[in-house]
From Swiss-Prot:
This is tRNA 2-selenouridine synthase. It catalyses: 5-methylaminomethyl-2-thiouridine(34) in tRNA + selenophosphate + (2E)-geranyl diphosphate + H2O + H(+) = 5-methylaminomethyl-2-selenouridine(34) in tRNA + (2E)-thiogeraniol + phosphate + diphosphate; 5-methylaminomethyl-2-thiouridine(34) in tRNA + (2E)-geranyl diphosphate = 5-methylaminomethyl-S-(2E)-geranyl-thiouridine(34) in tRNA + diphosphate; 5-methylaminomethyl-S-(2E)-geranyl-thiouridine(34) in tRNA + selenophosphate + H(+) = 5-methylaminomethyl-2-(Se-phospho)selenouridine(34) in tRNA + (2E)-thiogeraniol; 5-methylaminomethyl-2-(Se-phospho)selenouridine(34) in tRNA + H2O = 5-methylaminomethyl-2-selenouridine(34) in tRNA + phosphate. The lineage of its organism: Bacteria, Pseudomonadati, Pseudomonadota, Gammaproteobacteria, Enterobacterales. Keywords: Selenium, Transferase. Involved in the post-transcriptional modification of the uridine at the wobble position (U34) of tRNA(Lys), tRNA(Glu) and tRNA(Gln). Catalyzes the conversion of 2-thiouridine (S2U-RNA) to 2-selenouridine (Se2U-RNA). Acts in a two-step process involving geranylation of 2-thiouridine (S2U) to S-geranyl-2-thiouridine (geS2U) and subsequent selenation of the latter derivative to 2-selenouridine (Se2U) in the tRNA chain. Belongs to the SelU family. Pfam families: Rhodanese. It comes from Salmonella dublin (strain CT_02021853). Monomer.
Length: 364
């Protein structure tokens, strides 16, 4: 076990999806964590705040003493049992705190007293975070090919089929548009960046990588924004544009936003609450672009959406949604994307239907 006492090969740890028992406070974990980490705090948020205040006013020794008073007795035992259970579940795991300092060492010592020798990450989360940032910058220097196309062109599916494809929207838990949110909440910015870095490292390690294949995205995907080093490279990258018939795009959008999202909401929350959540999801997506539509047009499309929802609820048919989706594409989404694409016209290297783009990618 001695060779695992302190881990410094941070890239290997990230590549292996190494389980991390993260003993930072919940607020720290929410602000940024590594994939595969579970949060089992040594101190809760209020306890950490009290210790921090004590440290500023009375110094390190007083703060340490306060920490031991706050985490003692039954509280200490409950947390110790949770760490023991986590290590038994993940015997190849590591303890991790902010910088590999007192918190992970204290938990390590308490576990050792029970006969468990759990190694820790030297440098803690901060060291892993810096490794992730550096890896993203380094790997973003490789050539990039973008997949473009109007909403409903099947771009994400095409990216997912590529061995060198990186599903940015999947990593962000958002499909990019005002209707793009999923049932899984988005990660914090730092956690998204960490997850992206690990994905890049894994794909790069699996093959001799000539280039990345990414979807043509804006600066932000929902609440997450792309790392600037990657965004700068994407702005200069060649683009293959999917140009599918409008009717085919509508069918993809029907399946994704009306059939699948309805299923996901009702599966998660039950029929009644799921239907309410699904309805609110569609209304929220339309509301988010009300100013760009103009308030009168927004009101008209909202009325049409209400009628479509009533029809879907009574008959199960999603046909009524086409009455607001078609004008939304024609008046808003398609003109917006085409305007953005025109500014990058010099970067376009191929155009064609979905299957032609897929075949072209294979030939590259």
């Amino acid at each position: 076990m001695q060779d695992r006492q302190k881990a410094q090969d941070y890239r290997a740890i990230l590549l292996a999806d190494t389980p991390l028992i993260d003993v930072r406070a919940p607020i720290e974990f929410e602000q940024g964590a590594m994939p595969g980490a579970i949060n089992l705090p040594l101190m809760m948020d209020d306890e950490r705040a009290a210790v921090g205040t004590c440290y500023k006013r009375q110094g390190a020794d007083a703060a340490l003493a306060l920490g031991h008073r706050l985490v003692c007795g039954d509280i200490r035992q409950q947390r110790l049992e949770a760490w023991k259970a986590a290590y038994q579940r993940f015997p190849n795991g590591y303890l991790c705190c902010a910088r590999g300092g007192q918190r992970s060492h204290i938990v390590q010592r308490w576990l050792q007293e029970t006969g468990i020798d759990c190694p820790l990450i030297e440098g803690g989360y901060k060291a892993l975070r810096q490794t992730a940032i550096q890896a993203t910058w380094q790997l973003a220097q490789k050539p990039i090919l973008l997949i473009g196309g109007c909403t409903g062109s099947g771009k994400t599916q095409l990216v997912r089929q590529q061995p060198n494809g990186v599903d940015l929207e999947g990593l962000a838990r958002h499909r990019g548009s005002s209707f793009g949110r999923t049932l899984n909440p988005q990660l914090s910015q730092a956690s998204f960046e960490n997850k992206l870095a690990v994905e890049l490292l894994k794909i790069n390690a699996r093959q001799t990588l000539k280039r990345w294949v990414l979807e043509d995205e804006g600066r932000t995907i929902g609440a997450n924004h792309l790392p600037e080093c990657l965004r700068e490279r994407m702005a200069q990258a060649p683009i293959a544009v999917v140009e599918d018939p409008f009717a085919l795009r509508l069918e993809r959008l029907r399946e994704e936003y009306f059939i699948r999202m309805h299923h996901d909401f009702t599966h998660a929350y039950g029929d009644e609450a799921g239907w309410q959540a699904y309805s609110e999801y569609l209304h929220h997506g339309l509301f988010a672009i009300r100013r760009r539509l103009g308030l009168q047009r927004f009101a008209e499309l909202t009325d049409t959406l209400d009628r479509a929802l009533a029809e879907q609820l009574s008959s199960g048919s999603t046909d009524g949604h086409m009455a607001w989706l078609v004008p939304l594409l024609n008046e808003y989404y398609d003109p917006m994307y085409r305007y953005q694409l025109e500014k990058k016209a010099a970067n376009i290297v191929f155009r064609g239907p979905w299957q032609d783009v897929a075949n072209w990618l294979k030939a590259q």
